[in-house]
Amino acid sequence: MTDRENVLFEDNADRFTVSGPEMDSHYGTGAVFHRRGGHFGSIAPIRVPESFFPDNSSVLYTIRPDGVSLISPREKSDGIKYSTEILMGDGASDIMIVHSIKNTSHERKKLSVWSSTALRAGGLEVIPQSFGDTQPMQPNRILALWPGTTLTDPRLFAGERYLTIRQDPEMEKEFILGVNNITGWAAYVLPDTTLIKRYVHDETSCYPNHDCSYRTRVSGCFAELDSFSPIYLVEPGEGIRHVDNLSLFTTRNGVNPVDETSIENFIHNLC
């Protein structure tokens, strides 16, 4: 087995944290959320402080034949309990990550699961455009932009079938974009490895972020590939869950970020 660089982002310098008066008043003085990198799950719509529980305590874990289960302590301020299953059976090519959120409070909550995968610098993100309904009088795509994000950003290429976003270590400004990703996948192409993230988009449900089931956040350090469950009304004692499937492929030739035929052939050869 050869040594390969981790495809996930690692915040070894602890640069990406959330703290301040809102965190202090909600979780206690000195509360800090550390992004750390890698993959994590939380609640959406994304907001401070609720989506940034400083989960710095020990977790309960169970080793299973096909993976591991992780259960965080009950989050007392909001009555939320998080659990994560990381599963990979013998001979499987995918890692399945199941995020579950239970409402342990006495109040109904309106929630979505936020499943975030942060990947290391130097890659190209590929997002399919979702055409959905083709009735000429109805819109069939949603594009959501966050404050500070512009469509003239040089990292973005908007084609007829795909969007591509380059992660550029020289550009610190964050680029954040959401889409109604009906096909339920996105790819991140590194020089020697490609990761594909898959999930199920339910066209009959409503999603956060102006009905976008997918969001990306690209900075000078990483690219974050985020999927979301539908929004649910969660009664006390009930829970919701969301599943991501992550696949890794060894790739050498890369892809032309502005050539949609090249992109389509590249993805087709992987899948």
Task: Please report, for each region that a protein language model flagged, where it lies by residue.
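Surface-exposed acidic/polar loop and edge beta-strand patches at domain peripheries
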Residues: M1-M96, T104-C271
